[in-house]
Amino acid sequence: MVSHTHKRRKRASATQLYQTCKAAGTCPSDVINKVEHTTIADQILKWASMGVYFGGLGIGTGSGTGGRTGYVPLTTGRTGIVPKVTAEPGVVSRPPIVVESVAPTDPSIVSLIEESSIIQSGAPITNIPSHGGFEVTSSGSEVPAILDVSPSTSVHITTSTHLNPAFTDPTIVQPTPPVEAGGRIIISHSTVTADSAEQIPMDTFVIHSDPTTSTPIPGTAPRPRLGLYSKALQQVEIVDPTFLSSPQRLITYDNPVFEDPNATLTFEQPTVHEAPDSRFMDIVTLHRPALTSRRGIVRFSRVGARGTMYTRSGIRIGGRVHFFTDISSIPTEESIELQPLGRSQSFPTVSDTSDLYDIYADENLLNNDISFTDTHVSLQNSTKVVNTAVPLATVPDIYAQTGPDISFPTIPIHIPYIPVSPSISPQSVSIHGTDFYLHPSLWHLGKRRKRFSYFFTDNYVAA
């Protein structure tokens, strides 16, 4: 048997995937973020580097110095043997260059997208603060070097970017906003805004509770179960009718204040004497009544609580009693036999009418010799008046007598009769002058002219 060994091909890196799928627009989001440095970690480092300065530590600078000690090469061999590495100061070892091999199945046409690398449109300009510089002191015996940084003129830079919404190169990375060393951020604005989403008018949904059936029946809430016949209640029947109107008289001899018989009765201090009805002994609470129907009768019920025993802490111990009175029975519905209408037993039924009437021929009924000469037609209408007697209601004999003899003193008032005569003799009214009023039909002088009246008062009216 010959075993064939298949060489495992190396998977394409994120950069290779980005070069081949970016033009087609099928790149995954994680590949685009990794190549374009837009991951969450890159964003954190980008914004954190604006306010934090690490100096020459070589963190995130991309210089490849590996810090103070440089890079330490990784072991390639058996595990478990730790190689001895001696760090020499001043000697910096760089990482080896990875050479990727080209397989025979790789495409011979090299994509030109690789040549268009990420374009940096510009680095932010950092302004030097106006205060004094940094003083550096060394530990040697030499004279320390003092860096005198002269303040420069502060210049405020505003960046405006004009974008073409028709085409935007995804490989161009927008620069970070310029930041001053003092921590002030210069915010730039863009003249082109993103496409706004489609504005859809919102409608208010009204929930209609329409009936689900053709003949809806209003539902009724189920009545709560009273539980009057449970094992926890003592059943006591009361025959005394006082239980319906004044049940407190069966519990105590006192004369209580008027209480509503339909409310719950509470007896705070039960008497030590025996109750008028021994069945109501030690009753401290009598709840409101309830009407129920059981086994064809109407039953009046009340639930009472006994206070048989009290503890020192004030806890009451006692049972519960169901007092009931059967008011009346519910009779069964009587079945009434219906009688046929239109027939009377007092009149006989005629079944054969052939012998009651004589049959004549039509020729015998015709008389052609009748003469209507010297005759006239007379229509008479008679009205018969029938008196209807309506019995009157009988009035009982009640002796009508006068009221008590009460006389009030009266004083006669005499008013003399004096004929009324006019105190002023009537005077005649004479009118002198030529005053007059126009007829209303003469007020309108034109179709579109204002209506007004003419009055002439040139003389006087004498009375």
From Swiss-Prot:
Please indicate the residue ranges that the annotation assigns to the motif Nuclear localization signal: 1-12, 444-452
MF terms in GO: DNA binding; structural molecule activity
- Give compartment(s): Virion; Host nucleus; Host early endosome; Host Golgi apparatus
A GO CC annotation given for this chain:
host cell nucleus
Q: Which one GO biological process term can you cite for this protein?
A: symbiont entry into host cell
Going by the UniProt record, its keywords in alphabetical order are: Capsid protein, Cytoplasmic inwards viral transport, Disulfide bond, DNA-binding, Host endosome, Host Golgi apparatus, Host nucleus, Host-virus interaction, Late protein, Microtubular inwards viral transport, Phosphoprotein, Viral penetration into host nucleus, Virion, Virus entry into host cell
| Keyword Phosphoprotein among UniProt keywords | yes
Q: Look up the domain of life of the source.
A: Viruses
Instruction: Decide whether keyword Phosphoprotein is in the record.
Output: yes
Cleaved signal peptide residues: none
How is the protein altered post-translationally, as described in the entry?
Answer: Highly phosphorylated.
Q: What is its main location?
A: virion
Q: List the disulfide bonds.
A: C21-C27
Family of the protein in this entry: Belongs to the papillomaviridae L2 protein family.
State whether it acts alone or in a complex, and with which partners, per the record: Interacts with major capsid protein L1. Interacts with E2; this interaction inhibits E2 transcriptional activity but not the DNA replication function E2. Interacts with host GADD45GIP1. Interacts with host HSPA8; this interaction is required for L2 nuclear translocation. Interacts with host importins KPNB2 and KPNB3. Forms a complex with importin alpha2-beta1 heterodimers via interaction with the importin alpha2 adapter. Interacts with host DYNLT1; this interaction is essential for virus intracellular transport during entry.
Which function does this protein serve?
Minor protein of the capsid that localizes along the inner surface of the virion, within the central cavities beneath the L1 pentamers. Plays a role in capsid stabilization through interaction with the major capsid protein L1. Once the virion enters the host cell, L2 escorts the genomic DNA into the nucleus by promoting escape from the endosomal compartments and traffic through the host Golgi network.
In Swiss-Prot or TrEMBL terms, this protein is called Minor capsid protein L2
In the record, what lineage is assigned to the organism producing the protein?
Answer: Viruses, Monodnaviria, Shotokuvirae, Cossaviricota, Papovaviricetes
Q: Which gene encodes it?
A: L2
